[in-house]
């Protein structure tokens, strides 16, 4: 079978990595790159940088990656769908739920694969976490808490931290727990003088009863990417910046210290850091997209799933505006 002919729209901070990995994945040939801003990162190689999505479509593509600012996702995606091109757009799916819904309809109606680049699902720590939860290693899951903090990224100008970063945590939480959100409550802050929120606190509950909490901001001088799952038998801590997964087991030995034994809760047990293969998440994601296009079993994030994530994120900001929780 001939390689899938791939086009890449946008070679900024994320698109440049797509350019590298698309050239490495078996079964894909990168035949065209488009970016109206040119090749700032020097990733074009032998390919001339085209001006727009129409020029890309003219190359006769099988698949496309859209890595442009969020406000341009819908226009590019609808043109690609009309041309019969299977497409993966970077997260979030779109700048609004209404826009994302039009994209879902376009790709579904055309019988095409429409996917969203929620790359955290392909992080080795989170994949191992989900596998161990499924295996019952933690027993019943009680709570999932995430922290995603760091300095402001110069690449983001058209959305706030909720859609840019909290979308990661909303998606990975529902995916790890295998349950959608039922309610969310949010608080936001604007501290940097920009038009969009740069700090978010969100809490909520999933349909399966798990309670969740997310701390997200662009105003921390240190970078933190952590997901903590507390359950019946202990706590998992996944560090997605390093790909590490650690399990803190509940203690099984009787306690003798009187002030501790008086507390009717859990005690500290063994701590285990797991060893497992750590493949590059973007490569695994693009392989999943390729497989979906070929009709093979795939864990690619569909546009329908991406739209649900965006709806929850918009629920967080709506809750912050009204002071009321939002239900789904």
Model-identified regions with their sequence ranges:
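Hydrophobic residues in well-ordered beta-strands that form the structural core
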Residues: 89-90, 114-116, 238
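C-terminal glycine/acidic-rich active-site capping loop/insertion
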Residues: 119, 233-304, 328
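Beta-loop-alpha module in the N-terminal Rossmann-like domain of NAD(P)-dependent dehydrogenases
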Residues: 18, 47-106
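C-terminal helix-rich "cap/oligomerization" subdomain common to oxidoreductases
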Residues: 1, 23, 63-65, 288-328
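N-terminal Rossmann-like dinucleotide-binding module
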Residues: 1-44, 173
């Amino acid at each position: 079978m001939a390689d899938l002919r791939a086009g890449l729209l946008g070679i900024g901070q994320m698109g440049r990595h797509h350019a590298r990995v698309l050239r490495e994945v078996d079964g894909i040939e990168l035949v065209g790159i488009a970016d109206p801003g040119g090749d700032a990162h020097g990733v074009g190689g032998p390919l001339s940088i085209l001006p727009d999505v129409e020029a890309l479509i003219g190359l006769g593509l099988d698949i496309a990656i859209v890595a442009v600012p969020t406000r341009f996702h819908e226009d590019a995606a609808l043109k690609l769908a009309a041309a019969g091109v299977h497409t993966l757009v970077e997260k979030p799916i779109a700048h609004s739920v209404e826009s994302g819904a039009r994209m879902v309809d376009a790709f579904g109606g055309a019988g095409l694969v429409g996917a969203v680049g929620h790359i955290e699902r392909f992080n080795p720590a989170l994949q191992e976490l989900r596998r161990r939860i499924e295996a019952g290693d933690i027993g019943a899951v009680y709570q999932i808490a995430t922290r995603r903090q760091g300095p402001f990224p110069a690449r983001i100008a058209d959305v706030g931290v909720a859609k840019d970063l909290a979308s990661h945590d909303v998606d990975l939480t529902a995916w790890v727990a295998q349950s959608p959100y039922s309610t969310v409550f949010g608080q936001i802050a604007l501290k940097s003088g920009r038009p969009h929120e740069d700090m978010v606190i969100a809490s909520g509950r999933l349909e399966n009863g798990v309670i969740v909490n997310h701390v997200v901001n662009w105003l921390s001088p240190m970078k933190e990417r952590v997901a903590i799952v507390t359950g019946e038998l202990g706590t998992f801590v996944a560090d997605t910046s390093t790909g590490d997964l650690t399990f803190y087991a509940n203690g099984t030995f009787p306690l003798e210290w009187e002030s501790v034994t008086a507390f009717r809760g859990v005690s500290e047990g063994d701590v285990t850091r797991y060893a497992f293969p750590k493949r590059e998440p973007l490569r695994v994601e693009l392989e999943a997209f390729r497989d979906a296009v070929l009709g093979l079993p795939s864990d690619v994030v569909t546009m329908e799933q991406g739209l649900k994530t965006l709806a929850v994120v918009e629920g967080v900001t709506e809750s912050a505006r009204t002071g009321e929780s939002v239900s789904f």
